[in-house]
Design a protein with these regions (language model features):
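N-acyltransferase acceptor-side catalytic subdomain
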Residues: 1-175
Length: 175
């Protein structure tokens, strides 16, 4: 059991090597959600994930789910939905609304890690040009989508929501 969890200094944006994370991927705690700190974290394979009113926790799980675009397979049913052009797909039109939809607590969940401080930080990162939303609209209404951070050739998806079946999947496909 690895228990090397490092405290972060609010005045330094230095992160420990993710190889020092615990068995669940927790690598550090503390610091703040300054957009520059968050971007440095992402470039080091680390991201914040914590409940409101708890200390900020910084994670780097191994293994991590990765979608290799050249190996991405679309199911027949999803392909049918994509080809139907049922949804209008847009990007970065309603970033904050997408985050707020992702924030809504699902019936089978106790809470959400997406709270106002997270929304404020990711909105600033969006304004910096690194956070993006992908959106599916049906008859002019936002019905699915998600958001994440883009660094070089890597997109780190953070959360998705769907008010209609396959809406977020179709938007993700077009990403």
């Amino acid at each position: 059991l690895n228990i090397n969890i490092f405290p972060l200094d609010k005045h330094s944006y230095t992160f420990p090597n993710p190889l020092y994370s615990d068995d669940q991927g927790l690598v550090a705690f503390g610091g703040d959600l300054n957009p520059n700190r968050v971007m440095i974290a992402y470039t080091n394979g680390i991201f914040p994930w914590y409940n409101e009113d708890d200390p900020i926790l910084w994670w780097s799980p191994n293994p991590r789910y990765i979608i290799e675009l050249d190996e991405f397979k679309v199911s027949k049913s999803l392909r049918k939905t994509i080809n139907s052009n049922k949804f209008e797909i847009k990007f970065d039109r309603n970033f904050v609304q997408v985050m707020n939809e992702c924030k809504k607590i699902r019936e089978d969940k106790e809470g959400t890690w997406i709270h106002e401080e997270v929304i404020e930080t990711y909105t600033k990162i969006h304004e910096m040009g690194f956070a993006h939303s992908f959106e599916a609209y049906y008859e002019g209404e936002l019905v699915g989508g998600g958001y994440g951070i883009n660094i070089g050739d890597i997109f780190c998806g953070e959360s998705m929501f769907a008010k209609q079946s396959d809406a977020s999947k179709v938007a993700l496909y077009h990403l």
